[in-house]
Amino acid sequence: MSDYVDGRDSGGTGMSAGSLVHTLYIGSPDGNSFGSADRTAVVEMLSSCFAGFTINDAEGFFEGRPVATLIVKIATGDTPAVEEVTRSIGRKLGQRKVGLELKGLYQSISMD
């Protein structure tokens, strides 16, 4: 078992203690592939809040229908900032809800 000192593993693995990973599930406005304008808007909104993140294209399902989905991974301890940008993205795309997963728990973030 290793102890972390100053954010580094004193056991010699060179790994940091890490950050929470937040995962967003963002469906496309019309269910089809994301248009370049919508994708650019998502990237710009995320970039204005976080130095780094990862986006994967996926096919999700909502109410039994396939929906082009962006899965976004953000490593940060600032959950309120993630929730705020999630709502901003959802409103920009005209979504009712955007999915947020944290610590293995999924919740739908409402735009209300």
Give residue ranges: language-model regions.
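Positively charged, small/polar-rich N-terminal and surface patches that mediate targeting and assembly
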Residues: 2-112
